[in-house]
Amino acid sequence: MKRYLLAIVLLLPFILQAKVAVEKPRSKQPTAFAIVVDQATYDKTAPQIHAYRDVLEADGLSTYILRDNWQTPEQVREQLIALMRKTAKRSPLEGVVFVGDIPIAMVRNAQHLTTAFKMDEDNFPMIQSSVPSDRYYDCPDLQFELIARDTTDRLLSYFNLACDSPQRLDPAFYSGRIRYPEQLGGDKYEGIARYLEKVVAERGKVDQLDNLVTYAGDGYNSDCLVCWMDERVAIDENFPLTDTRKAGNLRQLNFRMDDYMKYRVFDELVR
């Protein structure tokens, strides 16, 4: 009996690893991209995810789809590091998007790496004084120490940035999230599906950027107006179709303009 138990224990890591389903790219491109999605979201939105994959490959990205019933951030990080190493020579991993309910790393002991967030970690609850950060995923050189799993939100895990870890941010790839806000109500899977359909539709349009809105918030380098002296030059160089002579084409907002600037920002998003 003990031999059987020992065999099961030894095989357990391989069994868990085998659960992750990896859909390989349909085309070979210079760089690679990964869609990381939870199994429930994939089951409800598979056609939209595949259509999204196809437009990414049309843009020149060999796109992988990684899906599983993700339980911890460690599982996701392990798979991304493995994929990054696998693709390093022939098609380096360029970026990742997390779709649906992907575990979130709540990072502590790292406020020297944040731009504006500063809070006493000793006197405030962990949920408030920790930083939800995907640098846990896209900075594989950083070292973390697990503190605890959240008891009310299964997606949250708390980590300390280790003292012997590199103390800088140097992402190996870019990352983003597609997640439906619970505050909106309704079916989150339908919401994600609609969003992906919209993304695919927009990718099929020939529509060059000719309207731009910028916003400089409080508690960042926007406090120093000198830092923004050359912003107009940078905008002209990067967005040549934005006619800076027309007020409606380029709007630059600053937190000093109003006591409650978020409503003006919301208006711009609606516009």
Q: Can you annotate each of these PLM segments?
A:
Residues 1-21:
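Bacterial Sec-dependent N-terminal signal peptides
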Residues 19-271:
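Cysteine-dependent hydrolase recognition
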